[in-house]
């Protein structure tokens, strides 16, 4: 099955959408998917590639999982620095193909952008609609200045080439303080949610462990400071 493309690599062109998900649910988490299905959310693939390889290898068999939610980001197949160029192009092609297939079946689809070194810029943004919404994530960016610089360069190139009106960031969008960004909407990661759950649970437990002390007693007149006349 092939889809319309203006790319030199025949990477499928996605259609624009105004849909903005209320939340993002991981492809491999059933309860998160169930919540997304009833709350206007969308699937995301900011996971290890092996966890969602089957969206490409068995698209029809796994389509019901996408259909149950009704909206999805495109798969985030990795583009590693040390990958052969052919493999990098292949992963971009697969990601857009899945998105185009889902769109053909009535699913709301938002493109996920990823990149590697600047020599990937000639193809890694192919198929992303101009002036639309694009999903990204700075998760996994290592602390080295070189990695952070590559991430910033990709963000700037995405803006220059596609002029997105909205960026959907999985997790806090870091390393971009010096870039003139469009509107950004950040979504909590799985670990953000877990930390909040643990924190809320601890606070609830602490409140139950400490008995109610009642209202704070008023300060009596005897407890008020007395000014002494030292010159008497």
Which sequence ranges carry the predicted segments?
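C-terminal accessory extensions appended to soluble enzyme cores
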Residues: 1-19, 181-232
């Amino acid at each position: 099955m092939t889809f319309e493309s203006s790319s030199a690599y025949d990477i499928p062109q996605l259609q624009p959408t105004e849909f903005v998900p209320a939340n993002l649910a991981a492809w491999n988490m059933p309860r998160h998917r169930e919540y997304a299905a009833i709350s206007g959310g969308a699937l995301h693939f900011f996971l290890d590639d092996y966890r969602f390889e089957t969206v490409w290898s068995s698209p029809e068999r796994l389509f019901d999982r996408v259909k149950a939610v009704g909206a999805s980001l495109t798969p985030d197949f990795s583009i590693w620095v040390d990958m052969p160029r052919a493999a990098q192009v292949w992963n971009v092609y697969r990601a857009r193909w899945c998105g185009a297939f889902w769109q053909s079946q009535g699913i709301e689809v938002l493109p996920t952008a990823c990149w590697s070194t600047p020599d990937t810029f000639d193809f890694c943004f192919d198929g992303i609609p101009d002036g639309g919404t694009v999903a990204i994530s700075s998760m996994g960016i290592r602390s080295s200045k070189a990695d952070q610089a590559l991430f910033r360069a990709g963000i700037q190139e995405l803006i220059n080439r596609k002029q997105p009106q909205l960026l959907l960031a999985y997790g806090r969008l870091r390393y971009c303080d010096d870039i003139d960004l469009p509107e950004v909407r950040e979504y909590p990661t799985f670990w953000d949610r877990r930390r909040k759950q643990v924190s809320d649970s601890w606070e609830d437990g602490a409140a139950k462990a400490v008995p109610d002390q009642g209202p704070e007693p008023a300060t009596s007149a005897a407890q008020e400071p007395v000014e002494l006349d030292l010159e008497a």
